[in-house]
Amino acid sequence: MSPRFGVFVPQGWRMDLVEIADPADQFDAMVSVAKQADQSAFDSIWVYDHFHTVPEPTHNTVFEAWTTSAALARETSRINVGQMVGCNGYRQPSLYAKTASTVDAMSRGRLYAGLGAGWYEHEWKAYGYEWTDIPTRMGCFREAV
């Protein structure tokens, strides 16, 4: 098997859209990157499953991963689409599976779905998720998988 390479699509998490003021224009820039990757030799495009910027939360736009993945899947035709990685703590396993299966159908089988235990405490608390210790989060992750 030959190596495969993917590219992260800017989505705001890493302060990579701050030079564009309008969120609609930010999304257009994301689509442009995705389409360029789709027309190149890249195997996949990726977005982060985060809600706030890093290293510090700001008021800048961060696009939600699953909604973005669904939209980019419809804007592209060949390239695989994935999240790096889905946070188990943000969605019950059954909701994660339902969402993933929907995006997989929308992409005609081009979804890469990853799952992790989560680490960004600020996001958990900001959205009302209980922040637990690592053993508890890992236990929930094992149960979900």
Positions of PLM-derived features:
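Conserved catalytic cysteine-centered active-site region
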Residues: 76-84
